[in-house]
Structure formats: C-alpha cells, structure tokens
Amino acid sequence: MASNVTNKTDPRSMNSRVFIGNLNTLVVKKSDVEAIFSKYGKIVGCSVHKGFAFVQYVNERNARAAVAGEDGRMIAGQVLDINLAAEPKVNRGKAGVKRSAAEMYGSVTEHPSPSPLLSSSFDLDYDFQRDYYDRMYSYPARVPPPPPIARAVVPSKRQRVSGNTSRRGKSGFNSKSGQRGSSKSGKLKGDDLQAIKKELTQIKQKVDSLLENLEKIEKEQSKQAVEMKNDKSEEEQSSSSVKKDETNVKMESEGGADDSAEEGDLLDDDDNEDRGDDQLELIKDDEKEAEEGEDDRDSANGEDDS
C-alpha cells in the first residue's frame, strides 16, 4: 500500500499528482482508489479526504494518462472530476456546476441517491474542500524582472480580460513553469552525471597507477629472487670447490706420508744390507784368522817332529 504523503510542493511532485474530485468517500476507500489508478503507473502516495482524494505518481506521464482515462468516470453513483494538481480546471469548486449521475445518465435505480439533507451537506462540504484546495495549491505566476531604470515605462491600455481567460493563462503558465522545472532538473541531472563521470575517471587513473606500482613491485621481487638464486648457486659452487681443494690437500698429505714411510723402509733395508755385509766380512775375517792359526800350528808341529 502506498504512503499517505501527497502534499509535496516541488514542481515535479505537483506535475505528477492527480486530484480526484466528487468522490463518494463514504463508499470508496483508499485501497479502492489505489486499485483503480495503479494501472496507469506506480503510485508512491495516496490520501483520501472527505469528498476528494489525491494520487501521487512517479512521473507526469502516468498522471496525465490517469486523468485522460478516469476523468468523468462514475464510481459509487458519482461522476469523478479528475485533473492534475498543478493544472486546476476552470470554474471548479463553484456551487451548482457539479453534475450528478442522475443528470448525466438519467435515473440510476441500482444506486439510490442519498437523502436530500445528506446530499446537500455533502455538496457543501465538497465545495468547501475544493475552495480550500484552490487556496492551498494555487501558485502565483512568476513576477517578471523589472524593466531597466534607463528606459521609461509607457503605460498602455489593455483590454480587460475575463476571469476564465486569466485562469487559463495562469494554468498554462503553471504548466510551462513545470516544464521549465523539469528541464532544470534534467540539466541538474546532466551536471551530476558529468561530476560522476569525472570522479570515475579519477578513480580509474588511481587504479591504473596502483596497478603499475604493483607490476613494478612484482618485477623487483622477481629480480631479487633471481639474484638470490644466483648468489646461492655461486655460494654452493664455491663451497664445493673449497671442499674439493680440501680433499685434494688431504689426499696429497696422505700420499706424502706413504712416500716417506716407503723411503724409511728402503733406508732400513739398506741399513740391514750394510749390516749383513759387515757381519759377513767379520765372519770371513774370523774364518781366515782361524785358518791361519791352524796353519801356524801345523807348521809348529812339523818342526817339532823333525
């Protein structure tokens, strides 16, 4: 169900508001009004008063369609008097102008008319409400700008205009002012769109710069990772070469020890051989001396025998 707010005074709301007069509010309720007028567009507000009602649409096109489709329709034995709230009809709200269903369509048997007292009081109340509506929602025409001071204003005789013509001119001016207001709101919307577009462009530039910074950071990180990997491989190669050098040094030291041991063994063998030769010579000398001693003994014994 729509809200009860139908008293906004901005031009857009006024141009999209429908006034429903000569409404039998004793029978017709707010839900009935919404059901009848919702087929012309979305209803954002609906208020039902004694003898009349207001329906607030989203835009002026829906309101004009509702006025064209429902004006003069008979509901609950009464003919509706419908128009835009910003464009009141000429001579409305005057006593004796309203037409009942019996006047337009003859006697209506299925909907008996109320008692004379009730009918007269209802008409008076309706007239009062319509006059109140005229006073509340009559918008004075815009005052034109004053003429320049330098130019003299020459009074001109104008023909007197009738009240009907003035009301028509006034209503026409109101519709024109509504159109100006709508064009102004369209211009404001265009300015808002331009501002939004500018903000979006700035946001896009910021996002692009952030993306560029992220790409630079990623490149630097990948470069640092490659450098760290190269340094690590160089360290591994240097450590492996150091280990290899240490292994070679160790092997060389072990080989030198083996050579020295072999040389020592060879020297020991030479010493042993020299010692063996000396012992053999000593043995030979001893044997030679022993033989010479025996020869001396033999010679001595031979002399004794002779």
Curated annotation (Swiss-Prot):
Biased amino acid composition, Low complexity: 175-185
Positions carrying Phosphothreonine: 109
Biased composition range(s): Acidic residues: 255-276, 288-306
Top-level taxon in the UniProt lineage: Eukaryota
Motif segment (Nuclear localization signal): 155-161
Residues where N-acetylalanine is found: 2
Keywords: Acetylation, Coiled coil, Disease variant, Intellectual disability, Isopeptide bond, mRNA processing, mRNA splicing, Nucleus, Phosphoprotein, Ribonucleoprotein, RNA-binding, Spliceosome, Ubl conjugation
Domain RRM, first and last residues per copy: 16-87
Effect of residue 108 to I: In MRD74; uncertain significance
Cross-link (Glycyl lysine isopeptide (Lys-Gly) (interchain with G-Cter in SUMO)): 250
Entries under Pfam families matching the protein: RRM_1
Protein purpose: Binds pre-mRNA and nucleates the assembly of 40S hnRNP particles. Interacts with poly-U tracts in the 3'-UTR or 5'-UTR of mRNA and modulates the stability and the level of translation of bound mRNA molecules. Single HNRNPC tetramers bind 230-240 nucleotides. Trimers of HNRNPC tetramers bind 700 nucleotides. May play a role in the early steps of spliceosome assembly and pre-mRNA splicing.
Designated name of the protein: Heterogeneous nuclear ribonucleoproteins C1/C2
